[in-house]
């Protein structure tokens, strides 16, 4: 939901309606159908789709589902993002479980029955096949995805910092997000956004 009066596209099916916690931010172009549950302090980005028309799709507290992501599941199955889960732009989750504090990279696909463990990461563009399990604090990558190595403390901390920025974006969006007309030219004193401190991982590694 938004404080600007703009509402996401929500649809019931067979009398089952989506649930959006009042502290969550769901972009007005996101689509939620049926048995879709968005928990406290979650962020759902532009163009995201949560289709709860077969199985249940669930976002637990503090998780984020970024632009153009898809969540869906077979009948009788759940698709779950646990607490502080982080789903990058364009990823597809189908009947899988992304566990606490885990990250799924941009344009990755995680298939039915797969599990991404606590504080684990799936690299961008990966394909996690059905039933595959990524252990806790492990990096998986490739098509199909394979176990690469254990994550470092620095990498896990980097992920957590990025997730906190999305949790702050929820607050920022509730406070100031609104539809507007664009300017026709740049102002001389155009301000920069106070958007947080996270940086790309390669930048962080170079700096430390």
Predicted regions: what they are:
Residues 1-19, 53, 61, 67-69, ...:
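Glycine-rich hexapeptide-repeat left-handed beta-helix
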Residues 19-73:
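A positional/architectural concept
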């Amino acid at each position: 939901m938004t404080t600007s009066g703009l509402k996401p596209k929500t649809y019931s099916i067979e009398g089952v309606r989506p649930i959006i916690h009042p502290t969550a931010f769901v972009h007005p172009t996101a689509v939620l159908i049926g048995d879709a549950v968005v928990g406290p302090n979650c962020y759902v980005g532009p163009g995201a789709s949560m289709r709860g028309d077969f199985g249940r799709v669930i976002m637990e507290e503090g998780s984020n589902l970024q632009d153009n992501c898809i969540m869906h599941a077979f009948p009788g199955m759940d698709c779950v993002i646990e607490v502080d889960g982080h789903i990058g732009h364009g990823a597809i989750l189908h009947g899988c479980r992304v566990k606490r504090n885990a990250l799924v990279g941009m344009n990755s696909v995680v298939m039915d029955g797969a599990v991404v463990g606590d504080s684990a990461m799936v690299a961008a563009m990966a394909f996690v096949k059905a039933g595959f399990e990524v252990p806790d604090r492990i990096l998986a990558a490739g098509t199909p995805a394979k176990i690469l190595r254990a994550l470092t403390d620095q990498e896990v901390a980097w992920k957590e910092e990025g997730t906190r920025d999305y949790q702050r974006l929820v607050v920022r969006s509730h406070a100031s997000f609104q539809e507007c007309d664009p300017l026709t030219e740049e102002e001389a004193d155009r301000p920069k956004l106070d958007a947080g401190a996270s940086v790309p991982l390669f930048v962080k590694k170079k700096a430390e």
